[in-house]
Amino acid sequence: MATEIFSDVVKSVWSHATAKHAHLRMAVQVDNRSRLLSDLVYQLEKRLSEETHLDDETYALYESQTGLLEDHMALVRKCAAQLDNSNTIDHRTPLDPECVFLFEMICPGVRYGKTLNSLWSKYAAQWPEKLIRQELDMVKPLSFKDEVAKYMEKMQEKTRKNRMTQKVINEMRIAHQKGWFFVFDTLTLADDRLQAFNENPNALRDYFRTVGRAVLRAEGRSVKDSYNDCYRYLCVPEFGGQHGRLHWHVVHMVRTLPLGSHDPNFGRPVRNYRQINSFRGMWPYGFTQPIAVRYQHDAYSRKGWLWPVDKSGKAMQSKPYQAVAWYVTKYVAKQSDQRQKAITERQKKCKNPLMAICLKKEFRVRSSRKLGMELPSMAHLSNKVLLELSRISFDSSPLYQIVKENAKKQLTLNIGALPLHVILDVRPEVRSMLKAIRRLMKKTPEFNWQSSIASMTVTLKNGDISDEARQYIIDAGITPTDLRAKATQTFGGK
């Protein structure tokens, strides 16, 4: 690998690599903790030297704080001494008796694994920087949220929303190609079941387990099996506009419909039913309305289900699955916008005290594990092509964030066999984007948010990437043309 490309690869996947590879993560955290403790020792000595009157109580406190820092420094130094820079970054270091002794003294009663890496992870979790500062009475003051910080929060929220949107589209694309069934459901909370819902923190988890096990039974499998290969879901919370009442919109993607599922329009003179009764009764806290999602060439048509009509008797408009996917994502965008609203505003609209208790909780978008992250393997691609894919923009694919994450994961695996010292030699400097933007605002009279942030990140247009990278996107079927909702026609129904 060329030196320039190698350096760019490490910079591109640094956060992924430190999260994935235990040896590298520990080396970085040990170095950061050593710097922190040295700085705290300096501040403690400086504070002591500035004391005009040193009584016994103050001196005893200083001795206690100094002893705490010395214990932590001893563990950090011992762990640093055990790190082998010539070993690979995915190496697992065996336990050292002295490290175990120091750990048990600092973290009494805390369990740890069989490697030094797991012991260090437990220590870092038990003693974060904030807790150490609290013990030393050196808590950092909360920073004031200026215009830059508020804008960055909005940008992060927008990025999360776009990422979830792309994951939903990709998951529905994959499910459509596999011939799965889509069911759209709305979960509500009945007044007489609010207390039971409030008392069960795992109500939603239990509901999705019930649906997953129903799919397993329909396939003749044990309910103890994992249903991740035959059932996927997305659940988006929403608060009603008039009374702020909590409910959820759910998209079920199933390989096999639960037992008892049949065409609701079979034998009916007017085919205007779409509810699937086999999904009802699984949510014990209110009402549900499970509806078959019909679109061009869907699994229901291949199963022989009749095409539904509207109230006037006309065949319902048939759209491609892409249009259905984009429709579902609007709920994700709406939930993201509602998160910005204050909880007190919702409670003012709510008359029921039990519902007001629900509104105090923060409900997030729930989904199956690794929803929408599946793409064709990138193991055959070169590091240069992977680096290009890790920098693509919307021009190349509407699923650009999914492609970038998969490319970075593959790059992270590719560098896993390299020695630790080789990676640390090209360790990128971690810069604060907040500080960088603030400096730009001072230097630039006519400051532009988008152009400034774009200048700090490397992105490639479709014309900037190689033919091999472009061919991967085409073969994966995730080009803008592939994911564009085309002209609506009536297809696939009887």
UniProtKB/Swiss-Prot annotation:
Example GO biological process: DNA replication
Zinc finger motifs (unnamed), residue ranges: 230-252
Record-linked InterPro entries: Replication_gene_A-like (IPR008766)
GO molecular function terms noted in the UniProt entry: DNA binding; endonuclease activity; zinc ion binding
Short name of any one Pfam family annotated for the protein: Phage_GPA
Active site annotation, chain numbering: Y327, Y331
Domain of life: Viruses
Assigned keywords, A-Z: DNA replication, DNA-binding, Endonuclease, Hydrolase, Metal-binding, Nuclease, Viral DNA replication, Zinc, Zinc-finger
Note in the entry: Phi KhT, a host-range mutant of phi K, can grow on E.coli C and B, besides K12, and is more thermosensitive than the parental phage phi K.
Function statement: The A protein is a specific endonuclease that cleaves the viral strand of supertwisted, closed circular DNA at a unique site in the A gene. The A protein also causes relaxation of supertwisted DNA and forms a complex with viral DNA that has a discontinuity in gene A of the viral strand.
Name the record gives this protein: A protein
Organism: Enterobacteria phage phiK
Gene (UniProt): A
